[in-house]
Amino acid sequence: MEILLLAVALSMDCVALSMSNGAKCANYGIFRITKVSFVYGFFQGAMPIIGFFLGALFVGFIEQIDHFVAFAILGFLGVKMIFDSRENSDEITANLGLKELISGAVATSIDALAVGVTFSFTSLNIWFSCAIIAFVCFILSFAATFIGKKLGEIFKDKALILGGLILIFIGFKILITHLGIL
């Protein structure tokens, strides 16, 4: 039960990003929604494994900069999405590039890397735990992308602006939480 709750918690940033991506890419069909969800699920599942094996070596360095990296990436993607809303005001048919997709996946899974470090101090099975995390993230991201797609079809450029603001907010929340302000 603990791992399921952890998986849901780790997936929340991906859910928000997926909803924003769905709004941005209202032309996406099931295949592309599945692809986006798979990438987010993969990174959420892989990062704890990386943290588990390499975390002890780099945990001090990662903890010092992870919030700045996440803030910069999510802030950039959010601002870009807001600017894109001005260009695509009639119809939202943007495509999410691989670089943008992976940047978002990395930014939203940095916390999973830190969780992986803590796994080395528990009796949890790392492989099973990470499979659960990846699967839960995939399912939640799939649903969120689909919901975002529908909202994007209804609200058009307003959905992009809201999605961009959500990404900026998530990045800001990560930053102020890690700095101890919140």
Swiss-Prot record:
Keyword Disulfide bond present in the record's keywords: the answer is no
Q: List where the protein spans the membrane.
A: 3-23, 42-62, 65-85, 126-146, 161-181
Task: Enumerate the GO terms in the molecular function aspect.
Answer: manganese ion transmembrane transporter activity
Pfam (any one): Mntp
Q: Which UniProt keywords apply?
A: Cell inner membrane, Cell membrane, Ion transport, Manganese, Membrane, Transmembrane, Transmembrane helix, Transport
Recorded GO CC terms: plasma membrane
Q: Does the keyword Transmembrane apply?
A: yes
Q: What is its main location?
A: membrane
Report disulfide bridges, numbered on this chain.
none
Compartments where located: Cell inner membrane
> What InterPro entries is this protein classified in?
Mntp/YtaF, Put_MntP
How does this chain sit within the bilayer? Multi-pass membrane protein
User: Matching HAMAP family, A to Z?
Assistant: MntP_pump
| Function of the protein | Probably functions as a manganese efflux pump.
Family of the protein in this entry: Belongs to the MntP (TC 9.B.29) family.
UniProt name for this protein: Putative manganese efflux pump MntP
The taxonomic lineage of its organism, from the top, reads:
Bacteria, Pseudomonadati, Campylobacterota, Epsilonproteobacteria, Campylobacterales
